[in-house]
Amino acid sequence: MIKVIIEKNETIINSIEVSGHSNYDEKGKDIVCAGVSAIVVGGINALINENKKAIDYECKEGYAKVIVKNIDSNINMILDVITTQLYTVEESYPKFIKIIEK
């Protein structure tokens, strides 16, 4: 199962951590892992393009984390898009992805 931890301070996202594999299907055919990977990597790329200094991030096989250092409206919007997309995947595949907000 993919585990997503979203740390928030009221409505502001401080970090997003994604770990694990969905095991929906075998590697190369797993649409849940592929979808989550595309959301997370694309989101990190958007954050970097907007303001690389606003975040710290780590991204490797089966794990990604974004920590927000400096928030502004554009960074916040990108983070909201990432989380909305992840919640959409969770709605469709609740046995394979779990989102926890702290």
Which residues are covered by each model-predicted region?
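N-terminal intrinsically disordered, cationic/polar leader segments
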Residues: 1-31, 41, 45-102
